[in-house]
Curated annotation (Swiss-Prot):
This is Phosphopantetheine adenylyltransferase. ATP binds at residues 11-12, 19, 90-92, 100, 125-131. Keywords: ATP-binding, Coenzyme A biosynthesis, Cytoplasm, Magnesium, Nucleotide-binding, Nucleotidyltransferase, Transferase. Substrate binds at residues 11, 43, 75, 89. Reversibly transfers an adenylyl group from ATP to 4'-phosphopantetheine, yielding dephospho-CoA (dPCoA) and pyrophosphate. GO terms for cellular component: cytoplasm. GO terms for molecular function: ATP binding; pantetheine-phosphate adenylyltransferase activity. GO terms for biological process: coenzyme A biosynthetic process. Its cofactor is Mg(2+). Gene3D superfamilies: HUPs. It comes from Citrifermentans bemidjiense (strain ATCC BAA-1014 / DSM 16622 / JCM 12645 / Bem).
Length: 161
């Protein structure tokens, strides 16, 4: 029986405990989860794509069923190319739903071979976003409960040299 793979796409700039929660929950459902770092989200990124890949790879090293890759272009093309059939998306609030629903419908319009699975963010992370983490860290606020220690160190290096 073939492995059931899912793709969890995002910018992960930086990865947060909210992202890791979705990955871990996805691994309970699927045989493998590909964490796909979007190359085309480079515009206002704090971390380069390579830095994000390195952070994610190190953080996920004890999760052999999760692998980190990059992609550009249409997500559904990438999903089909890697042999997956499901896209995982985390929803923090109703405000996320409208945008995510539109993306899922567009992907469905392009191909019926790819499904989107919406996962509600666990309550402790319902407010958490990479943007909030960057802003708090930039202002020298505490982010140790929001991101893994490796990410906190990387943020400190970016903002405080």
């Amino acid at each position: 029986m073939p492995l059931k793979l899912a793709v969890y796409p995002g910018s992960f700039d930086p990865v947060t405990y909210g992202h890791l929660d979705i990955i871990d929950r996805g691994l309970k459902i699927f045989d493998g989860v590909i964490v796909a770092v979007a190359r085309n989200s480079e515009k206002n990124a704090l971390f380069t794509v390579q830095e994000r890949i390195e952070l994610l790879t190190e953080i996920l090293k004890d999760r052999p069923e999760a692998r980190v890759e990059t992609f550009d272009g249409l997500l559904v093309d990438y999903v089909r190319r890697v042999g997956a059939s499901v896209v995982i998306r985390g929803l923090r609030a109703v405000s996320d739903f409208e945008f995510e629903f539109q993306l899922a419908q567009m992907n469905r319009n392009i191909t019926r071979d790819v499904e989107t699975l919406f996962m509600m963010t666990s309550v402790p992370y319902s407010y958490l976003s990479s943007s909030i983490v960057k802003e708090v860290s930039c202002l020298n606020g505490p982010v140790d409960k929001l991101v893994p220690p490796l990410v906190k160190s990387a943020l400190d290096a970016k903002f405080r040299g």
